[in-house]
Amino acid sequence: MDDDGELGMFFPSWTSKNPIDTVESRGLMFSCFVAALVGILTIAYTAFQWRRNINLSWTKAIARSKKNPKARHKVPVAPHSWELDPIARAKNLNCCVCLKSMSPSQAIVASESFFHRCTICGAAAHFNCSSSAPKDCKCVSMVGFEHVVHQWAVRWTEGADQTDDSSFCSYCDESCSSSFLGGSPIWCCLWCQRLVHVDCHSNMSNETGDICDLGPLRRLILCPLYVKELTRNPSGGFLSSITHGANELASTALASIRIQSKKYKQTNETSADTGNSGSNCDESTESTADTGPTVNGAHAVLENSISVMNGDSSNGDSDSNGKLEKKPSVKRTGSFGQKEYHALRSKLKYELADLPSDARPLLVFINKKSGAQRGDSLRQRLHLHLNPVQVFELSSVQGPEVGLFLFRKVPHFRVLVCGGDGTAGWVLDAIEKQNFISPPAVAILPAGTGNDLSRVLNWGGGLGSVERQGGLSTVLQNIEHAAVTVLDRWKVSILNQQGKQLQPPKYMNNYIGVGCDAKVALEIHNLREENPERFYSQFMNKVLYAREGARSIMDRTFEDFPWQVRVEVDGVDIEVPEDAEGILVANIGSYMGGVDLWQNEDETYENFDPQSMHDKIVEVVSISGTWHLGKLQVGLSRARRLAQGSAVKIQLCAPLPVQIDGEPWNQQPCTLTISHHGQAFMLKRAAEEPLGHAAAIITDVLENAETNQVINASQKRTLLQEMALRLT
């Protein structure tokens, strides 16, 4: 009892036995809780509005400073490149003209369901405002300027992957992030991504002259000082065509005389340098005679006044098959027929002039239909990091040839393919057709579904790996420091019973499949063609693959498969297992999104060699149905090894589905012959181990040695191939 009295003295409301008091106390507590919650929400809303007003005041301050004649920058005007975007994507965006919010709630009529978005700098504008927008977009050409100058602008988007180090003012080293109480408005350079306070800009401009060094990606960026805008004069088209053709003819003749003179003077040296390339002299003469203008140090393709290559003109080139092993002795960077030359040139707005010999720009190809179809956002992020001129979008009407034509006179450049395995093969085919003396090495940004080639080159299995590697900026830096390796390419000929080709040959980089796996790929391909909107993410793509595979489990379509195909490897007949429902010929160690079919660590098969993507040998395995494919995917089973060899024949005795690198079709009875076609240079992300860094450094040293004419392109190619073989 005494204890109850003491407890009641300390907590009278809790221990009161009066029900009315209890209800009142609970009501009071609930009221206090609601009041506290409302207060917190009010404070949060006030803080949000405060922050929003601060950001808006910053934007207005920057806009006012840009209108100040004394503060205008000496940069050529560049209009925005507008495209339509749904208003749902306008969240947290302000119009770059009226500075009003573009939130979706303000879309009242149907005409306002879209807005204009700049594909280069990310600026947004209302329909009625876009025509009045200031011409302060990224200026891709600064020909005539002595130095690249900063292009200060409002940071309309966060897609530039800002790092912690770049969030400070480049002049005063103070933080550029806004505080709760405000702060100083900032500018962001569209080239180097550095930030500067608007108040600091005048002092910085007086001290440095606003010279921009293009930032940490300067070697990959196509410098605007060397990008020249093409001027077209329709009225003088015929006369200019004649003049242009005469200039080309004179330039080519002069170059031939110089080459012959150089060969006379350096006969012994050339024969020692080229080694066994003498047998290709007739072939090189033939190839240069039947093509249009070719490019090297003296072979000017456009204007004779523009020369972007210097070096020995007697270096090797690729043979008629585009192979890397044997190269003719005439140096050139690319070949185009007259019709193709004029057709490609008409599609370009710019050309490259007087690039320095140590330039290493990156040529980017994007296939926005690959995988999750995120090409638009990826393109805009690349426009922010690089020069928009060096970024090309692939489509059914424009292939890689246009970009390669623009870069045809660049002695050393690298290629980035943003897409899947099919896109990578498309670009490799186009590179091979140009007969580059120094073929560019290719890196892959995995934007497809399986991304098998990207996996074996350490670039990851999807766009999620880009963020895990530190963002797009880090990936671009990894490309600059990547090691060059080689990839075997295989020619697949489709022959009838008489040995005649039924269609042009196809080329394989990853694998070729016949049977159940090709059937699943064909079903997915048809579904994508009918309903492309269903393939909006890499995960959903794999779910659809799994669904189609599950359907095929109950379908015994390939129970007679072992008697419908005959396999021959290096002239030896290979027995197809009776439970086989598919045959796979693999060139790389990744299939169907990361499945290792050969498994080099497996010691069960002692009579087989480890798999390699540049040993000029393919591996043949069998799979026993779609259920087996599913178990391979989760690591519960293994493919059955059948053979290894350099020449494979697969005879189809019945109509069967076939796929090459994920591109499927139904094939009537025929014979598929697979033979080694050549090798392509690829970029492999350097691992953390010292060996990976050493390979990247050696690659850079060899490129510099070729630039300084210590070695020629043929010698560099041979050394790179040898290095790739020894370091694997």
Swiss-Prot record:
One of its GO terms (molecular function) is ATP binding. It comes from Arabidopsis thaliana. Belongs to the eukaryotic diacylglycerol kinase family. One of its GO terms (cellular component) is membrane. The chain crosses the membrane at residues 27-48. Phosphorylates the second messenger diacylglycerol (DAG) to generate phosphatidic acid (PA), another important signaling molecule. PA is required for plant development and responses to abiotic stress and pathogen attack. May be involved in the accumulation of PA during cold stress. Its main location: membrane. Disulfide bonds: none annotated. It is an enzyme of class 2 (transferase). It is a single-pass membrane protein. Residues 357-496 form the DAGKc domain. Treatment with (E)-2-hexenal, (Z)-3-hexenal and allo-ocimene increases plant resistance against the necrotrophic fungal pathogen Botrytis cinerea. It comes from the Eukaryota. This is Diacylglycerol kinase 1. Residues 267-294 have a biased composition (Polar residues). It is found in: Membrane.
